[in-house]
Amino acid sequence: MYVDPGIDTSASNLKWVLPYCKPDLPRVVGALLLFIANNTMALTIPILSGIIVDRVIVGGHADELPRLCGLMILMTIIRVGARYGYQMWMERFGQNSVYRLVSDEYEKLHELDFTYFNHTRTGDIMSRLTSDTDAIRHCLSWVSYQIADCVVMFVGALCVMFAIDWRLALVLACVTPFIFVLTRGLSTHAHPLFFAIRNSLASLNSMVEENIEGNRVVKAFVREPYETEKFDEHNDDYMQRNMALAYNSRKYMPWLDGLGFSLQLITLGLGGFLVIKGYMTLGNLVSFNSFLWMIDGPVRQSGWLINDWQRFNASCIKIRKLLTEQPRIVEKPDAVEAVKQAVTIVEQVKHDDEATGATGAPVASGTSGAQQSTERKSCPLHIKGDIRFDHVSFAFPDDPETPILKDLDFTVPAGSKLGILGETGAGKSTLVSLISRFYDPTVGHVLIDGIDARDWPLATLRSQVCIVAQDTFLFSDTIGGNIGFGASGDSDDRYIQKMAQIAGADNFIRSMPQGYDTVVGERGVGLSGGQKQRLSLARALADNPSILIMDDTTSAVDMETEAEIQKHLKEMDGGKTIVAIAHRISSVKDSDLILVLEHGRIVERGTHAELVAAHGRYWDIYHKQLGLQSGVAQGF
């Protein structure tokens, strides 16, 4: 990440965002120089206007007019060029800063675990990455120099006006305290309103995103009017929040505009009187009137700038909350070295056990400690595929009183197949999520190759334990690109096609007009459920995992295709450990161990033959699926 979000969580929003701006500070220095040039010209041009009136129009020195006008034109050109330059540099400054901020947000999202995404709406996350970051960009790129411009112009104009005529300037200055009181009131009331607008916009985005994703369900149930009504409610809430902000501005802006008009009235009235009395020249009055916009402009603009500043603060609060979110699944420090050491110990114990079992007495390994240390450092982290659940119980962190899994205890040797059956909600998907460490067990240990899953580096564990989830997701890419997503960078087309063949997808892919170059939507639009499942399986196989978890992966596939896939999986090299969750007996009957789950507990375990012979829950499921009556033989 570009900036550590936990460095100073109590810092103000402006101080918090500065580290993202730091690499572009030289650009800000350049913009500041152009800003000074622009404002110097802006403060000088009105003085020249007064000189022209006094020297040329009143004094009759017409020969000075070309020189003074030429000087004004030159200053105007310099001012326009300088203003364009610093505006472009500040825009680049804001864009670069937000680029780094969005990158950190996106990286943070990848660090967060399933618990966060289970309880955070997609629209809220999208608002953090889009509208909230744009509010920060707007503040850095535009509001920052507008505030500086207003302050410099206001103070600079007052100073010059005091130098021209202190009496008129003093009267104008007496109006400014009322301006600051009004702007303070506007700011105080605007802050909670902007925060409410941000929340309402996030809710609206979530609702729209949910409907776009579920548009097929909406159409299938003819719920368009209902969803439109829901959208209108969210949209109306967003409108009302914005109207509340508009009412707040309307309450203060007329007073601010009125004070701005009073400045012009005082200048013309009192200034005209002073000219008539001879206390100031007509040229000075013209200069005063030209400076007036530098007083009036900041007064009128202050209300809008305060609104933008409060929008910036509300957005910062939202983004900081995301960046400081703490993931529950955290990799231990020095996990790589710790696992290498643990692997060496496990291998040594196995070696000693084998030696003792063969001779009846311990046998020296013949390898020194230094040699073992060297081997450990050079040993690549590879998972063989042993899985052990040691009295594991689990409850979701936000509901610890409701256990999902209860005292699970079983072992799956490397290269074998585990089948899991159970009713919907029995905890099957949660069980396999513990293997990839998407969650940590509440009680007990999940051991991979004899090492606690919490000790493995997350990248190693998840790269070699691959889940083909129930909810198939395909990226907006070609079919080949979707399958290759799970493969290493050096995989070629032949490898991708081989994985598709194993998953039973090659034939239907080749039947498409563009074959593997066919582009599919993010949800696999245009593909059947079975085709999407087979592509997801091919993507997982392309990752060449040591442990392959199939979460009801072939539920939408016909029996013949499923049998072909099972055959190909058995023939694969490498001896993968396969964990198959299914509702169909045919998907798990060839497993070395079958678990039957009910309400988070293992109620039966064994091979297919053992469970059928036991005449228990598995036997009931088996006979119902085969369409048999209890005790009636049908040749199976």
Q: Positions of the model-derived regions?
A:
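Helix-loop-helix
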Residues: H61-R67, V160-P177, A244-L323, V349, ...
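Membrane-integrated ABC transporters
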Residues: M1-A42, I57-C69, Y86-M90, G94, ...
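An intracellular "coupling" helix at the cytosolic face of ABC transporter transmembrane type-1 domains
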Residues: L18, P23, F114-T115, S131-L140, ...
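Transmembrane helices of ABC transporter permease
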Residues: P23, R27-N38, L71, M75, ...
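ABC-type nucleotide-binding domain
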Residues: V339-F636
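Alpha-helical segments in transporter systems
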Residues: K15, P26-I47, I51, L68, ...
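Short intracellular "coupling" helices and adjacent cytoplasmic loop segments at the cytosolic face
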Residues: Y2-I7, G59, Q95, S103-S127, ...
